[in-house]
Amino acid sequence: MVTLTTLLKLGNTFFDLDPAGVGFVFNLNFLGTLLPSQVFCKGMALRGQGTVINISSMNAFRPLTKIPAYSAAKAAISNFTAWLATHMSEVGIRVNAIAPGFFLTNQNRTLLTNPDGSLTPRGNTILSHTPMGRFGTPEDLFGTLLWLVDDEASGFVNGIVVPVDGGFAAFSGV
C-alpha cells in the first residue's frame, strides 16, 4: 500500500493563515495517510505480512517558507510512519516512507517556473541549492519505492523516511 495525499495552500503571511485552511491541508495529508493505513493494515495483519509506504516530504525535515500547514502535516506523516512501524512489525508489516524533495509537477509548477518555462526566483534558489541541478520527476521515486517494497532487498528496513531530493538536504551552501 502506498499513501499519497497532498495539496498546497499559500497564505500571505503567518498572521493571514486561516485556521480552517490549515486544518484542511493538515487533515488532507495526515488523515489521508492514517485512514487508509487503518483499513489496509487490518487485512495485512490478518495475512501476517505487508508493506506500507507513506509519502512524506523533505519539508518534514526542514520546513520551507510559505507552506507551514503542509510542512507540519508531512512531519506528522514521518512521525506516524515510525510509530506505525513499531506497532505493525509485531504482525509482520513493515512501514516506511519516501520524502520527495522538489519535484516539478502540476501542483507546484507555477511556484517554480514562469509561463515561458524559465525559473521563478524561488525555482532558481532551489536549483542553486540542489547538487544534482534539476527538479525531480515522478520516475525518480520508482527505484526507492521498488527497493522498499522488495522483502529481499529491504526486509530488515522498517520505520525510516528515505530522502529523494537530488542532494538538497546535503547542500551546505558553501
Predicted features by range, described:
Residues S89, R94, F156-N158:
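Short, small/polar-rich loop/turn modules that mediate ligand/substrate recognition or access, typified
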Residues S57:
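Residue(s) in the substrate-gating loop at a strand-loop-helix junction
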Residues N12, P63-S71, W83, L111:
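Active-site loop-to-helix junction immediately N-terminal to the catalytic Tyr of the SDR YXXXK motif
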Residues R134-V164, A169:
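C-terminal substrate-recognition "lid" of short-chain dehydrogenase/reductases
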Residues S37, A73:
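Active-site helix of classical SDR
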Residues M1-V2, L8, F15-L34, Q49, ...:
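Catalytic Tyr-X3-Lys loop
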Residues F15, R62-P68, E90-V91, G133, ...:
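Active-site loop immediately N-terminal to the catalytic Tyr-X3-Lys motif
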Residues K42, T86-E90:
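Alpha-helical segment proximal to the catalytic Tyr-Lys
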